Amino acid sequence: MGSKQSAPPKPLQLPQPRVSLLREAKPSLYGRYNCKCCWFQDKNLVECSDHYLCLKCISSMLKRGKNCEICGKAIPTYIEVGITPTAPQLN
């Protein structure tokens, strides 16, 4: 009936997996984990493929592009904030 063709369907984009936010850096054999970009922060770290980045460095990298400047992979944008207990549970 109409002369217009329907638009082809867009491919489904799977959502990026959620990455957990580390409030405190995990201790390791060689000391604490730090942000691999600024080498200063050891709190509020997000895991990016094989290293950790702080929130400040992630936001500054996202302003410049979508890929990590250290490993070249996509920067994690979906962050899961875990609930940490603030007091011991009552029995």
UniProtKB/Swiss-Prot annotation:
**Domain of life the protein comes from:** Viruses
> Which Gene3D superfamilies does this one have?
3.30.160.310
Function description: Plays a crucial role in virion assembly and budding. Expressed late in the virus life cycle, it acts as an inhibitor of viral transcription and RNA synthesis by interacting with the viral polymerase L. Presumably recruits the NP encapsidated genome to cellular membranes at budding sites via direct interaction with NP. Plays critical roles in the final steps of viral release by interacting with host TSG101, a member of the vacuolar protein-sorting pathway and using other cellular host proteins involved in vesicle formation pathway.
Q: Which family does it belong to?
A: Belongs to the arenaviridae Z protein family.
Task: Give the positions of lipid attachment, kind N-myristoyl glycine.
Answer: 2
| Short sequence motif named PTAP/PSAP motif, residue ranges | 85-88
Spell out the molecular function terms from Gene Ontology.
Answer: RNA binding; zinc ion binding
- The principal localisation class reads virion
The stretches annotated as zinc fingers (RING-type) lie at 35-71
| Record's subcellular location | Virion; Host cytoplasm, Host perinuclear region; Host cell membrane
- Domain remark from Swiss-Prot or TrEMBL: Late-budding domains (L domains) are short sequence motifs essential for viral particle budding. They recruit proteins of the host ESCRT machinery (Endosomal Sorting Complex Required for Transport) or ESCRT-associated proteins.
Organism, per UniProt? Latino mammarenavirus (isolate Rat/Bolivia/MARU 1924/1965)
> What is this protein's gene name?
Z
The record's Gene Ontology cellular component field reads: host cell perinuclear region of cytoplasm; host cell plasma membrane; membrane; virion component
Assembly mode: Interacts with protein NP; this interaction probably directs the encapsidated genome to budding sites. Interacts (via RING domain) with polymerase L; this interaction inhibits viral transcription and replication, Z partially blocks the product exit tunnel for the releasing nascent RNA product. Interacts with the glycoprotein complex; this interaction plays a role in virion budding. Interacts with host eIF4E; this interaction results in eIF4E reduced affinity for its substrate, the 5'-m7 G cap structure.
**UniProt KW Endoplasmic reticulum keyword:** no
Database matches in InterPro entries: RING_finger_Z_arenaviridae, Z_RING-type_Znf_sf, Z_RING_Znf
- Membrane topology of the entry: Lipid-anchor
* One Gene Ontology term from the biological process aspect of the record: viral budding via host ESCRT complex
Q: What is this protein called?
A: RING finger protein Z
Q: Consult the record and explain the modifications the protein receives after translation.
A: Myristoylation is required for the role of RING finger protein Z in assembly and budding.
**Keywords annotated in UniProt:** Host cell membrane, Host cytoplasm, Host membrane, Host-virus interaction, Lipoprotein, Membrane, Metal-binding, Myristate, Viral budding, Viral budding via the host ESCRT complexes, Viral release from host cell, Virion, Zinc, Zinc-finger
